[in-house]
């Protein structure tokens, strides 16, 4: 299965081959290791997934670091791909998210890789026979022209400084990601999602991202229930402010399944207290059914471990400081999932683990304690630690950036505890990659 070739704009084939080889050695062994760890994929499934990664994803991660205009800002390590493990009591699976950079990455002609995103999404949609009704609407609503993208990049430092504590200077990124996609690996197939950053349009126009998103939601077909959108708009406006929406995500499905597809809004908070979690998960008390209460009870019992505080925390108002307060750091994230015809969104909690961890080794211990508390076998016999080491090397290894990125939690009666652990593969020098090839 090979997607339609994207125009390479005269790029040297030998250069492209080296770029793809670099990304292959950056993540393919790690992905294969995680696939094996889940015990959910047969030999044919694993081969199919590695082929999809090699043929559809690696060519679209941009140039290798030495040839790129700058790093990806998807992950802390600068990697354009984030691997993850999804776990429930009955099944584990692998997922990955990647910034859409095409062959050229962010370039002078396409500074935020907007046109690249349109081309790659169209190609993937054709390959997997997916509807483009929502994806085209999402991309067109938040896209900017190359000239506008250059304006956004010039405006970025001042815009970011407005979110940093007074008197502090932060290390400004050269750009912000515009579009990402993710693949849930289901057997030999993938379920695709598309994510677009509404902040690009916000920076350019001065219109808060939330206002832009509500307009997008209300014009989708099949339509979302007005009651559900109104409820979410009131809550986010009252609790998060007009610029809280970080990402808009959609399920990419065929036309027959569009009526059950999700739109996901991601918002951040500047507090990590469990009181904040309770407020967001219940939409200020609007959602208070038995399932929500049960999920909150489980989450509360492991909250200190997710915050990397194994000795416990003082109370539900405990607000853990981030590791580096000079950075633009959001303390928690929440996603609100809407489907056509539903009255309430489903809320998932995300912890940016990298903001709180001391070392990957300590985080492994905390995650294993979480698995034990949730009756998941990865908490026994140092199983999770072995999974991590097999994929990424010893946790004791000195790294500039941690490999653990984020963690998410959701509880439903159907799946039980649903957790996702996210990983940022370290960016290696090209001489290191060549050494690994020789070895």
Swiss-Prot record:
The UniProt keyword set, sorted, is: Transferase
Q: What is the consequence of disrupting this locus? A: Leads to the accumulation of paspaline and 13-desoxypaxilline, but also lolitriol and a small amount of lolitrem J.
Give its E.C. classification number: 2.5.1.-
GO biological process: one example: alkaloid metabolic process
Q: What class of enzyme is it?
A: transferase
* Residues annotated to bind substrate: 95, 193, 262, 264, 266, 350
Disulfide-linked positions: none
Under the heading Pfam families, the entry gives: Trp_DMAT (PF11991)
Pathway participation = Secondary metabolite biosynthesis
Q: Which GO terms describe its molecular function?
A: transferase activity, transferring alkyl or aryl (other than methyl) groups
Q: What induces it?
A: Expression is down-regulated when the stress-activated mitogen-activated protein kinase (sakA) is deleted.
The family classification in the record reads: Belongs to the tryptophan dimethylallyltransferase family.
The UniProt function text for this chain reads:
Indole diterpene prenyltransferase; part of the gene cluster that mediates the biosynthesis of lolitrems, indole-diterpene mycotoxins that are potent tremorgens in mammals, and are synthesized by clavicipitaceous fungal endophytes in association with their grass hosts. The geranylgeranyl diphosphate (GGPP) synthase ltmG is proposed to catalyze the first step in lolitrem biosynthesis. LtmG catalyzes a series of iterative condensations of isopentenyl diphosphate (IPP) with dimethylallyl diphosphate (DMAPP), geranyl diphosphate (GPP), and farnesyl diphosphate (FPP), to form GGPP.
Q: What is this protein called?
A: Indole diterpene prenyltransferase ltmF
The species this protein was found in = Epichloe festucae var. lolii (Neotyphodium lolii)
Taxonomic classification, please?
Eukaryota, Fungi, Dikarya, Ascomycota, Pezizomycotina
Name of the gene encoding the protein in the UniProt record: ltmF
């Amino acid at each position: 299965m090979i997607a339609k070739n994207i125009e390479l704009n005269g790029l040297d084939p030998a250069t492209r081959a080296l770029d793809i080889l670099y990304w292959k050695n950056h993540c393919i062994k790690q992905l294969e290791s995680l696939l094996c760890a889940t015990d959910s994929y047969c030999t044919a499934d694993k081969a199919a997934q590695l082929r999809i990664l090699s043929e559809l994803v690696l060519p679209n991660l941009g140039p290798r670091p030495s040839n790129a205009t700058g790093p990806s800002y998807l992950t802390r390590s600068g990697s354009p791909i984030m691997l993850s493990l999804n776990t429930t009591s009955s099944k584990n699976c692998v997922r990955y998210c990647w910034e859409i950079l095409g062959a050229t990455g962010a370039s002078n002609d396409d500074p935020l890789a907007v046109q690249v995103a349109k081309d790659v999404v169209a190609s993937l949609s054709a390959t997997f026979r997916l509807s483009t009704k929502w994806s085209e609407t999402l991309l067109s609503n938040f896209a900017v022209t190359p000239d506008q993208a250059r304006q956004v990049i010039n405006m970025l430092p001042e815009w970011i400084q407005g979110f940093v504590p007074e008197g502090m200077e932060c290390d400004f990124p050269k750009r912000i990601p515009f579009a990402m996609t993710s693949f849930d690996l289901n057997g030999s197939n993938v379920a695709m999602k598309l994510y677009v950053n509404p902040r690009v349009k916000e920076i350019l126009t001065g219109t808060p991202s939330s206002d832009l998103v509500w307009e997008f939601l209300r014009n989708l077909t099949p339509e979302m229930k007005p009651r559900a959108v109104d409820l979410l708009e009131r809550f986010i406006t009252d609790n998060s402010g007009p610029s809280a929406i970080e990402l808009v995500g959609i399920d990419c499905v065929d036309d027959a399944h569009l009526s059950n597809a999700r739109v996901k809004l991601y918002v951040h908070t500047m507090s990590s207290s469990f009181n904040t979690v309770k407020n967001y998960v219940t939409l200020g008390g609007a959602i208070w059914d038995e399932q929500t209460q049960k999920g909150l009870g489980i989450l509360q019992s492991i909250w200190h471990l997710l915050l990397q505080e194994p000795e416990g925390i003082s109370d539900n108002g405990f607000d853990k400081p981030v590791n580096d307060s000079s950075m633009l750091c959001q303390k928690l994230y929440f996603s609100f999932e809407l489907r056509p015809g539903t009255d309430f969104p489903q809320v998932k909690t995300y912890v940016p683990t990298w903001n709180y961890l001391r070392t990957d080794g300590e985080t492994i211990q905390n995650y294993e304690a979480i698995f034990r508390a949730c009756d998941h076998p990865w908490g026994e016999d140092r199983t999770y630690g072995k999974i991590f080491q097999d994929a990424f090397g010893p946790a004791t290894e000195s790294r500039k950036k941690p490999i653990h990125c984020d963690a998410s939690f959701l509880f439903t009666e159907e799946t039980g505890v649903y957790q996702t652990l996210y990983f940022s593969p370290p960016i290696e020098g090209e001489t290191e990659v060549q050494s690994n090839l020789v070895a």
